[in-house]
Structures are given as structure tokens and as C-alpha cells.
């Protein structure tokens, strides 16, 4: 996964039933990835993050400006939420879809299964270390003091376009 060893945040886990429950792809303008977009309505990233347990395991559609893209494999992108500093990661299995770094600053409509991953302290260190490596930033494992919980969208389809 990701070519990143045993980083727990690199694997996706989409329920086959959730992956199968969709209609035809909608005509959403932009570059299509994976299944494209099949749900007509988006929920806000703010709404999802305010109560992630209500959405865990469900197929949802979100939208936002692409804030960052995996520079190593193109296997994820982050979408900006409604609040400053708020983002939601859209992660796919390596090779299923590859997102270009040029997507940063563009608008994305993304669809997938909401996943919540409570991590141990050791797993949190691995995730933070991997993120620092991807960003070319220094990392001190001692800086991680408590475990984190990741809430993200394991991706089924996306459309990326220049603007909203």
C-alpha cells in the first residue's frame, strides 16, 4: 500500500456492498476518476466531521477545493472544509486512481465510504512520520504525545475541475 510500509493510514477498507450500491455515474463536469459521481447530493465536510459516527460505513458525496495531493503515488487528496484549517482526506487503493499534483487549487466532488480509524500512539507516530516524509519535513517521534483518530473518505469516485 502506498509503498509506505506498515503505515495504518495507507490501506483502504471499502465494504463491497457499499461499493456496489450506486446508480449510473451522473454527468458532473470535470475529469472523472474511478466510478465518477453517482450520488446527487453532497454533505458538507463540516457536517460530516461534526458527527462522523453518523456516517461511518456509509457512502457519501463531499465537495471542496483540493488542498493537497499525495506527491508519492497520487493515492489521496485533501479537500478544504468550511472552517479554516479543516480538511477531509479522500484516499484510494494504490493504482485504482491516480490524482495529479496539478489538482491542488481545483474543485473536487468526491464519493466514497466514510471511515473512522482510532489509532494507537505507536500507529499515530508512524502516520505522522509518513506525513512528514511526504511533505519533506523533519519529524521528531517524541513530539507525538497522544493517539489520534483519522476520519476520511475511502474513495470510490471523484471528479476534479477548475472551479466550483
State each model region's role.
Residues 1-164:
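OB-fold and OB-like single-stranded nucleic-acid-recognition modules
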Amino acid at each position: 500500500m502506498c509503498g509506505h510500509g506498515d503505515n495504518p493510514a495507507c490501506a483502504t477498507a471499502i465494504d463491497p456492498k457499499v461499493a456496489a450500491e450506486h446508480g449510473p455515474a451522473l454527468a458532473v463536469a470535470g475529469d472523472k476518476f474511478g466510478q465518477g459521481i453517482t450520488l446527487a447530493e453532497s454533505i458538507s465536510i463540516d457536517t460530516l466531521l461534526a458527527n462522523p459516527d453518523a456516517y461511518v460505513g456509509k457512502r457519501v458525496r463531499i465537495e471542496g477545493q483540493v488542498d493537497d495531493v499525495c506527491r508519492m503515488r497520487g493515492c489521496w487528496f485533501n479537500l478544504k472544509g468550511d472552517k479554516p484549517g479543516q480538511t477531509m482526506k479522500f484516499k484510494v487503493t494504490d493504482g485504482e486512481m491516480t490524482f495529479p499534483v496539478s489538482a491542488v487549487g481545483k474543485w473536487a466532488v468526491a464519493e466514497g465510504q466514510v471511515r473512522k480509524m482510532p489509532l494507537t500512539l505507536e500507529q499515530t507516530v508512524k502516520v505522522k512520520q509518513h506525513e512528514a516524509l511526504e511533505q519533506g519535513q523533519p519529524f521528531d517521534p517524541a513530539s507525538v504525545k497522544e493517539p489520534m483518530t483519522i476520519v476520511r473518505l475511502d474513495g470510490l469516485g471523484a471528479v476534479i475541475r477548475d472551479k466550483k
